[in-house]
């Protein structure tokens, strides 16, 4: 069985991927503790608990993952001042922590979900909101790695 990490597995896309893949693969997932009740209780599911990025780094390095599917995000259509840190932490910082680890771990497949709002009205580099701008920025980090 392949070992797959799915981030954002309690969201709409991530939960559907988890449901579709869980019977055929070993699935690792990172979950905020307040979302644990939403998770499928399959024998193939491994939940990665962590309190900070250093702890996550140590745990990821012990895994031999084949694929990472990155669905985790913090979505806010019309952000407020207090949303900025949450958007940056979830949509840019967390993804970069993953990418840095995966680069060292030599994981071959990284699938990232983004948004069509990166190119609002069909115009390239015309983000609809801060959320879509953060997703676009993360795409640049993916290109770096």
Please place each PLM-identified region on the residue numbering.
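Catalytic Tyr-X3-Lys loop
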Residues: 81-96, 100, 133
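NAD(P)H-binding glycine-rich loop region in Rossmannoid oxidoreductase-like domains
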Residues: 50-90, 118-122
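Conserved cofactor-binding/catalytic machinery of classical short-chain dehydrogenase/reductase
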Residues: 67, 93-94, 109, 137-138
